[in-house]
Curated annotation (Swiss-Prot):
Keywords: Ribonucleoprotein, Ribosomal protein. Part of the 50S ribosomal subunit. It comes from Deinococcus deserti (strain DSM 17065 / CIP 109153 / LMG 22923 / VCD115). The keyword NADP does not apply. GO terms for cellular component: cytosolic large ribosomal subunit. The keyword Ribonucleoprotein applies. One of its GO terms (biological process) is translation. InterPro entries: Ribo_uL30_ferredoxin-like_sf (IPR036919), Ribosomal_uL30_bac-type (IPR005996), Ribosomal_uL30_ferredoxin-like (IPR016082). GO terms for molecular function: structural constituent of ribosome. Belongs to the universal ribosomal protein uL30 family. Pfam families: Ribosomal_L30. This is Large ribosomal subunit protein uL30. The gene is rpmD. It comes from the Bacteria.
């Protein structure tokens, strides 16, 4: 699945910043192809308000 960072992590709680970094995203507009696994889905779900997800 493809994830794209759509909103900034500035001013967000540290655990959300860490989750976005763990997903491999750094700047707004960064995209990444990730495996669709339960662990990744949980990470994406915890910061879904910052991301755009394409199946």
């Amino acid at each position: 699945m493809k994830i794209t960072l759509k909103r900034s992590v500035i001013g967000r709680p540290q655990h959300q910043v860490d989750t976005v970094k763990a997903l491999g995203l750094k700047k707004i507009g960064d995209s990444r192809e990730v495996q669709d696994s339960p662990a990744i889905r949980g990470m994406v779900n915890s910061v879904k308000h910052l991301l755009e997800v394409e199946a």
